[in-house]
Design a protein with these regions (language model features):
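Mid-chain, well-packed structural core segment of small domains
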Residues: 61-93
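Active-site donor-binding loop signature of nucleotide-sugar glycosyltransferases
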Residues: 31, 79, 115
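N-terminal first-folded block
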Residues: 3-52
């Protein structure tokens, strides 16, 4: 089974392609709304598409602003100004997505993907 994912403008095209190559349905922000759209518009579009949001935007990791229980799922990639960890982070994410490929596994959860772990908040 594949996941429905919505990548925002911060996510490199290579990541989008890697997710597609893994068999996931990936929607790209710039194909649906302007790249400069407010965060609220971005997450609303993910909801409208019934997709898990994938973002490098740290604002989506704020559970006070974006309570996980209100969304189909948020995957926040935690680079923290360390681009050298990006390959490790992507490997961790793709391995996790392969092992957990059903949408209900993501609903109402925030996934903080770091190079050496994934933290999950409900």
């Amino acid at each position: 089974m594949s996941l429905r994912l919505f990548t925002d403008h911060c996510v490199p095209n290579s990541v989008t392609q890697e997710l597609r190559d893994a068999g996931h349905d990936v929607f790209v922000l710039k194909e649906h709304i302007p790249p400069e759209s407010d965060d609220a518009v971005v997450i609303a579009k993910a909801q409208e598409l019934n997709a898990v949001l994938v973002s490098l935007n740290g604002d989506f990791a704020d559970i006070a602003t974006y309570p996980p229980s209100q969304y189909k799922g948020i995957i926040a990639l935690q680079i923290r100004n360390r681009p050298e960890v990006f390959p490790l982070l992507m490997r961790r994410l793709t391995n996790y997505l392969m092992a957990h490929s059903e949408m209900p596994s993501y609903e109402g959860r925030l996934f903080l993907v770091e190079a050496h772990r994934i933290r999950i908040h409900k």
